[in-house]
Amino acid sequence: EYRVPKTKIPRRGEQAAAAAVRLPFSLRFIGGKGSAASTPRVRLSSEHAAIKFEVIPMEYYHMGTYDVAVVGAGHAGVEAALAAARLGCRTVLFTISLDQIANMPCNPSIGGTAKGHLVREIDALGGEMGKAADVCFLQSRMLNRGKGPAVHSLRVQADRVQYHNYMKQVCEKTPLLEIKQAEIAEIQTESGRVTGVVTSLGAQYTVSAAVIATGTYLNGRIHVGQVSYESGPDAALPSRPLGKNLQELGLRMRRFKTGTPCRVHRRSIDFDAMERQDGDDHIVPFSFGSDPSRMHNQVSCYITYTNEETHRIIRENLHRSPLFSGQIEGVGPRYCPSIETKIVRFSDKPRHQLFVEPMGMQTEEYYLQGMSSSLPEDVQLAFLRTIRGLEHVEIMRPAYAIEYDCVDPTELRASLESKKIAGLFGAGQFNGSSGYEEAAAQGLVAGINAALAVQGKPAFVMDRAQSYIGTLVDDLVTKGCEDPYRMMTSRSEYSLILRQDNADQRLMPLGHALGLVSEERYQHMLEKYQLVAQEKKRVEKTNIAPSPEINAFLESHGTAPLATGC
């Protein structure tokens, strides 16, 4: 029973009374063991100054039997579901919204330093992210060209909507994979093993394994200035009951935070006042099966900088930032700080770089990379208009911070299976990582191992010495993380040999043995490296004498000239 002042209860019947009273708590009811976690039917009556609630537990109804259930259809969930289905398991992929499949709620880009290595490795194992990026890219650049080839990293700006459509269609057309729009509220277990999942509507699915890939949806809360509200990314519905259910199952949970910049309108940007950044003339695909001759850059990106006036406005409004007021409790990403954090942490810097990047070909939205913020919207507009080229900028979507629940990754084995519950796997931001590429890599590993577990086969565990994916998983499950984990080349002690250009040689045999890489594709890789071996032998037998022409060529490529023959 909840009591309210009489003046707040109208005399038009209990339905009007129910609508008029704003309750300081949620009507969502989490049932005990054996009952549904759902939004219950509620009977209301207004008597004197009280409203009474009678909770009626929702009954289950069975909706199907599957081998593997994947909860969440972001970058981790999509790769997990595709891998499990392609390995012969009847798989069901759950998402709160079909319109959010493989969504890019932050930067619409794929790759980057170390992240490009992950995408290449995903492709070599038979994953989908590299193919999708090649189809949907707007601009392609190879980063770190001034350094050695071990740290060359491919990065593309992607069309956000096209990427979503591509991945959604791939999932829809994959045999043995079904997609359901539903919120999973409960993981059912028996004798320490996963037996099923239940939706918020009471639909029960019998499964042998489940992959949790909830991203930032799990108890998500958005912050913009002093305003905060329950939400997933991009104002999507959050997932609330599942978090409590996982705690009841004994998983050790924690609270992390991330953020995203605002999106601005193209026509309000003065591109002539900015530094233009074009894509590479020679495009290198992410997927080893893509044809580079059919790939072309479509757009340019732009660079501009903050200044002292920008920093002054931010400093004067730090008291309105939930990051500094204590409103946000979650731990944020160390290597992707908000602009207000940069101003405080690097107070000696007179300016900070930002990149102005398109969101797609069918939209006027632009993304401001490097300007993540949780300051109020009016402050965001004020400091943006101090930046060269953004003096008349118009905000289409304000920047925000989002808090979410995730698991302590040391709760997981190297297969990404829970140490406490057999058949329960974690992937992506649920495991404490950040980034689309890190999520997709874990999703692939979790999906493979969920399928192998159902089939009674040994787990697939990748070694640090053979891949960045192995390094990523090993770091998470053995060292854990106190803030969202980001992959970097410096995290691998084998970085000199784990180049992105030899990912196929390193990992495609594993993908082929699993059944994710076709025989045709595998043979093509073997033929490629037979030619490489032949060329190495030819070069070893060839002597080159120093000459002005040869030395000029070597020096133009940053290599020392020859003094003697070789």
What does each of the following model-derived ranges do?
Residues 244-254, 309-328, 357, 371-401, ...:
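Flavin-binding catalytic cores
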Residues 367-433, 461-474:
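A glycine-rich dinucleotide-binding beta-alpha-beta segment and adjacent secondary-structure elements
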Residues 15-24, 33-34, 38, 52, ...:
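Compositionally biased low-complexity segments, especially N-terminal hydrophobic helices
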Residues 439-460:
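Internal hydrophobic alpha-helix adjacent to the cofactor/substrate pocket in enzyme cavities
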Residues 82-188, 201, 209, 213-230, ...:
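Conserved N-terminal/central alpha/beta ligand/cofactor-binding core
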Residues 491, 497, 508-513, 517-566:
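Extended, charge-enriched "interface" segments that sit outside catalytic cores
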